[in-house]
């Protein structure tokens, strides 16, 4: 088989780049004919995947962390439409922990990821799209495969994306550090949520959305006070399912409400989330 591989050497604190020769040799045993692109800046992966699909490549593999995988996924779409509906996407997560891997029953780490590709099957999966605002107020849209969220989790993702602490102390330590910092700075966040048969103004700590079965699984975690935020982090919130969710902060919410997709900062509310059923061929 042939494949176009998007590779981020800086993922996993630079360990992916150090292991590149081993990764290349392991991939070649599965895909004897490959083309490679090494990312050097944010957003490059999406542009290169889009160009590769238009050039006729039918198998795209992303090797890296959450950001690389999400960027590559976004390259499959342009202006709300699929660039090449018959193309196949797969990913090799090079980190030590991944919610995306857990969703699809995969082990993190490049060795486990490539080993799984040897017997992986292609199936249609749902993706979702969020339309929101950038930090500067410009409309943006992002596709996601695993999950998106806004509120406290979005703030944590935004902080992680701009900090260098993970490179020196590891992702797990950095996540705990930024989670604590975000919680200490947390202020009441009230958001209007509109979905199928649901319209409510709620005090939230975070709202998580994941595409599954043609709908969005939505979990709303309460957060009127810091004590309630701590409690919500230890228990499941209210759940609903809808093909679409619109969220907008109320006037008494201080500061922007951050949005993240697959662990990467995407923008701020207001936002609309919608599912695209069976929109991607995923080798998993």
Regions found by a protein language model. Give the residues of each.
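ATP/NTP phosphate-donor binding region
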Residues: 1-63, 70, 74, 111, ...
